[in-house]
């Protein structure tokens, strides 16, 4: 006999786990389906692990300048990349364990496996059919690997990486070419430059951090350049040949090399495989209204998969809003 729930949430990131906990606290019988580890991109492959790297970089730079504060050190200041990665893993594990504890404490049934959404009323996990009155899709997004000549081959060799692979790289790169000057690219540029890597950012737009206010963009670009990071704007990558990146700037093609090449050109909603539901889409993004409802009754979509604002705190608020709408609690609606 199938288990029955009021709400099944597919995806255990910030939107999914917050929605699940909130629904349970409101008294609903709720299940959360996650194929990897709860916490999503933010806790496992994004916000949190990158901040641990930034903290290590900050400590390293502070110690190097310790004499400015009247503190002397003996010998040359160095770093152990494997220990930096290990510390990152420890912080991530601590936080994801905390999320798992909160889910259990609040009585959420967690299913580890791929959630196959058959309809608004059925989700199959590991061959088990779960029945529900409502489904919340919180499947997140994945980094885009652009169809630039040579990128696929270099990606398969581990030379081209996305942010997810770069967080777990074992051999520290002495040089790195970063394609894309958005938040992710700039964050990694800051980290690797701090530890002494030669860093080059290639950005198609007229400046880095294109979604930020101009005052911030200009000021931070100056800071990065002062610290030795090369920033190439209005530049387009034409091809990749193993460690070599050829780009076009002002009508002239130039080739540079890097131990690693980071592709940070954006993300794409994880909506593949949901076509049979008849969802209204905007490219890969699932269209939703202010209550996070899709065009299919009983199906909601929150977080990166709806493509509105791909930020963890936005996903969390969307999750709460969707749950309140399902359970008819209050009159909350999203106002971006």
Swiss-Prot record:
The keyword Transmembrane helix does not apply. It comes from the Bacteria. It is found in: Cytoplasm. GO terms for molecular function: dihydrolipoyl dehydrogenase (NADH) activity; flavin adenine dinucleotide binding. GO terms for cellular component: cytoplasm. It catalyses: N(6)-[(R)-dihydrolipoyl]-L-lysyl-[protein] + NAD(+) = N(6)-[(R)-lipoyl]-L-lysyl-[protein] + NADH + H(+). Keywords: Cytoplasm, Disulfide bond, FAD, Flavoprotein, NAD, Oxidoreductase, Redox-active center. NAD(+) binds at residues 180-184, 203, 237, 264-267. Its EC number is 1.8.1.4. One of its GO terms (biological process) is 2-oxoglutarate metabolic process. Its main location: cytoplasm. It is an enzyme of class 1 (oxidoreductase). Disulfide bonds join 42-47. SUPFAM superfamilies: FAD/NAD(P)-binding domain (SSF51905). Its cofactor is FAD. FAD binds at residues 34-42, 51, 115, 304, 312. Homodimer. Belongs to the class-I pyridine nucleotide-disulfide oxidoreductase family. The active site is a redox-active disulfide bond. Lipoamide dehydrogenase is a component of the alpha-ketoacid dehydrogenase complexes. PANTHER family: DIHYDROLIPOYL DEHYDROGENASE, DISULFIDE OXIDOREDUCTASE. This is Dihydrolipoyl dehydrogenase. It comes from Acholeplasma laidlawii. The gene is pdhD.
């Amino acid at each position: 006999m199938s288990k029955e729930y009021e709400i099944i949430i597919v995806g255990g990131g910030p939107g999914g786990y917050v929605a699940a906990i909130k629904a349970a606290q409101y008294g609903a019988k709720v299940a959360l389906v996650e194929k990897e580890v709860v916490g999503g991109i933010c806790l496992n492959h994004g916000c949190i692990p990158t901040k641990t790297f930034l903290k290590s970089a900050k400590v390293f730079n502070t110690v190097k300048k310790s004499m400015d504060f009247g503190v002397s050190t003996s010998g040359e200041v160095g770093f152990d990349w494997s220990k930096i990665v290990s510390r990152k893993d420890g912080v991530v594990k601590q936080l994801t364990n905390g999320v798992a504890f909160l889910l259990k404490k609040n009585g959420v049934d967690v299913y580890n496996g791929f959630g196959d959404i058959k309809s608004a009323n059925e989700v199959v996990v590991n061959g088990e059919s779960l029945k529900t009155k409502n489904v919340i899709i919180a499947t997140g997004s994945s980094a885009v690997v652009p169809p630039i000549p040579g990128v696929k081959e270099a990606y398969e060799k581990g030379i081209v990486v996305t942010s997810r692979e770069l967080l777990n790289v074992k051999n520290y790169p002495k040089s790195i070419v970063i394609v894309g000057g958005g938040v992710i690219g700039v964050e990694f540029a800051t980290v690797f430059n701090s530890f002494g890597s030669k860093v080059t950012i290639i950005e198609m737009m007229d400046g880095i951090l294109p979604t930020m206010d101009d005052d911030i963009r200009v000021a931070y670009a100056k800071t990065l350049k002062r610290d030795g990071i090369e920033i190439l704007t209005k530049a387009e990558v034409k091809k990749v040949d193993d460690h070599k990146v050829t780009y076009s700037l002002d009508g002239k093609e130039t080739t540079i090399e890097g131990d690693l090449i980071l592709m940070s050109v954006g993300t794409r909603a994880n909506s593949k495989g949901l076509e049979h539901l008849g969802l209204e889409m905007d490219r890969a993004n699932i269209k939703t209204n202010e209550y996070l409802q899709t065009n299919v009754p009983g199906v909601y979509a929150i977080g990166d998969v709806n493509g509105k604002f791909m930020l963890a705190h936005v996903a969390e608020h969307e999750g709460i809003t969707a749950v309140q709408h399902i359970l008819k609690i209050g009159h909350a609606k999203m106002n971006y």
